[in-house]
């Protein structure tokens, strides 16, 4: 059949389907599911059930009121949509719960089995003159043995190593020392001492140690160095310096003259331009 019927329980409450709602995201779109509501008043029996018939090919009615243009989500904010929901997987829930519990409450269980050691008090009466109350306590403590519980927990792998790592050091091989000096001691003569004598560094400009040079040695040194004065080269140097000074002065003078000429030319062009503008303004007036 092309048409489908919808049952209305009461005349006051009517089930409404509207295209103003947004399209479902997780469902396929089928235009055959669109219905246009047709209202009908039941006058004979107000308590009887009414039927609202809709057809697939019926033309939608124009909205007669302003309320019909408002979306259902705004008109009925507490409207509950019974969309199909996937069933919950209990295995996934249990796994996630187990992981979260292990993160929030880390278990302090030992890695290996628990060991128990029985301990007895070796000194039942340590005090020589105890009180009667202390004697009773000591008797009860000595008679009752203690049991110590030993657990081995997992160590943190991020902790630094407890023991120092020794490198593979090789054994040091000590060889016999080879002496450069001759073992045969010889007596140093005066000639050898003079031959290996190194004089101190003495300068005419720098003498931090305060050494002095004898006059005889100074006079001997002056005789070997001839005193000469190169007058020709000194004359050439003085003439070259004077010529360079004159050339620099002439260059400065020429640069100043060229700069002054440029300034005068710019001033003349500026004055001519101003005069031309003034003449144009006078011509426009007359």
UniProtKB/Swiss-Prot annotation:
Organism: Candida albicans (strain SC5314 / ATCC MYA-2876) (Yeast)
Record function comment: Involved in pre-mRNA splicing.
Keywords: mRNA processing, mRNA splicing, Nucleus, Spliceosome
Protein name, entry field: Pre-mRNA-processing protein 45
InterPro entries, A to Z: SKI-int_prot_SKIP, SKI-int_prot_SKIP_SNW-dom
PANTHER family: NUCLEAR PROTEIN SKIP-RELATED
Low complexity composition bias: residue spans: 132-145
Compartment(s) where it occurs, according to its Swiss-Prot or TrEMBL record: Nucleus
Domain of life: Eukaryota
Ranges in coiled-coil conformation: none
Main location: nucleus
Oligomer and partners: Associated with the spliceosome.
Gene that this sequence comes from: PRP45
Region Disordered, residue ranges: 111-146, 253-286
Compositionally skewed regions (Basic and acidic residues) per UniProt: 253-279
GO cellular component, one term: spliceosomal complex
Gene Ontology biological process terms from the UniProt entry: filamentous growth of a unicellular organism; mRNA splicing, via spliceosome
Record family assignment: Belongs to the SNW family.
